[in-house]
């Protein structure tokens, strides 16, 4: 039985862990050929798949983006059918009066500028083939001011605006661009950070919101897994969502309702 992404060529950033790796695995399951990208080494779970290629690089470096796209085109015969911008970094919950330059610069570079440059690089190929699908990973922080620090919040809000502009501008070329906004997901994006660097005063203002989010859960509730978010990405990349373009889709157990 053919998968819903059969023979499509897809670039997946953040493919070494979390939502990115889960999405790469799901895309391969659905028949896609995947070019994975991450700053971390290639995950062992994907090394033996002959439809998977990998580039270890820092997307904050512009030459890395050019290399990723050119290598993907070379390996997969001049095609890029879809781009999943999933790579992301978190801030230390700093507010506008405490955010460090390093937090701000890194969040904007990885969460906003890299997706823009990758889209800029793949759009010509997609336009030439009159088909393309771009899915950008935002966050609850992309639609709320009370979910993260100012750097992460600004970068994820910006990504939504960027995506809407791309969706409108290139709809005539049969290129779709949608956004997924996950809530709390069991990944390493926060656990890998140093809590001593957090702005705890700013973080304390968010805790009541988080308390409301995680209250009133059904019996047996568990935190959302990367694989659950990945299935949403696969749906948006498939022909089942052919009329969905420019959408911002929350995957957050009703967090977006408050």
UniProtKB/Swiss-Prot annotation:
Q: Which residue positions are annotated as catalytic?
A: 138, 152, 156
Write out the entry's keywords from A to Z. NADP, Oxidoreductase
The family database entries (Gene3D superfamilies) matched by this protein are listed as: NAD(P)-binding Rossmann-like Domain
Provide the binding site for NADP(+). Answer: 12, 58, 120, 152, 156, 185
Asked if NADP is a keyword of the record, the answer is: yes
Pathway annotation from the record: Secondary metabolite biosynthesis; terpenoid biosynthesis
Is-annotated flag, keyword Oxidoreductase?
A: yes
Record-listed E.C. numbers = 1.1.1.-
Q: What class of enzyme is it?
A: oxidoreductase
The entry assigns this protein to a family as follows: Belongs to the short-chain dehydrogenases/reductases (SDR) family.
| Purpose of the protein | Short-chain dehydrogenase/reductase; part of the gene cluster that mediates the biosynthesis of 15-deoxyoxalicine B. The first step of the pathway is the synthesis of nicotinyl-CoA from nicotinic acid by the nicotinic acid-CoA ligase olcI. Nicotinyl-CoA is then a substrate of polyketide synthase olcA to produce 4-hydroxy-6-(3-pyridinyl)-2H-pyran-2-one (HPPO) which is further prenylated by the polyprenyl transferase olcH to yield geranylgeranyl-HPPO. Geranylgeranyl pyrophosphate is provided by the cluster-specific geranylgeranyl pyrophosphate synthase olcC.
More about this protein: The 15-deoxyoxalicine B cluster is a rare cluster that contains its own geranylgeranyl pyrophosphate synthase (olcC), in contrast to other related clusters which rely on a FPP/GGPP synthase localized outside of the cluster.
Protein name per its UniProtKB record: Short-chain dehydrogenase/reductase olcF
């Amino acid at each position: 039985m053919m998968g819903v992404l059969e023979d499509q060529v897809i670039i997946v950033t953040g493919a070494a862990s979390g939502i990115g790796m889960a999405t790469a695995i799901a895309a391969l399951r659905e028949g896609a050929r995947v070019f994975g990208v991450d700053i971390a080494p290639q995950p062992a779970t994907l090394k033996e798949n002959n439809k998977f290629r990998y580039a270890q690089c820092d997307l904050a470096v512009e030459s890395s983006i050019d290399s990723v796209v050119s290598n993907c085109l070379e390996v997969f015969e001049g095609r890029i059918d879809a781009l999943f911008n999933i790579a992301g970094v978190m801030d230390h919950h700093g507010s506008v009066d405490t955010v460090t330059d390093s937090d701000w610069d890194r969040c904007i570079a990885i969460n906003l500028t890299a997706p823009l440059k990758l889209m800029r690089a793949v759009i010509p190929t997609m336009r030439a083939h009159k088909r393309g699908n771009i899915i950008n990973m935002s966050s609850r922080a992309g639609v709320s001011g009370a979910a993260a620090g100012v750097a992460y919040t600004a970068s994820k809000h910006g990504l939504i605006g960027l995506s809407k502009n791309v969706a409108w501008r290139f709809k005539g070329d049969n290129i779709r661009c949608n956004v997924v906004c996950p809530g709390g997901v069991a990944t390493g994006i926060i656990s890998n950070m140093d809590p001593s660097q957090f702005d705890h005063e700013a973080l304390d203002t968010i805790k009541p919101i988080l308390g409301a989010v995680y209250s009133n859960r059904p019996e047996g509730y568990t935190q959302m897994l990367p694989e659950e978010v990945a299935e949403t990405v696969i749906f948006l990349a498939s022909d089942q969502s052919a009329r969905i373009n420019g959408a911002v889709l929350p995957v957050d157990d009703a967090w977006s309702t408050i």
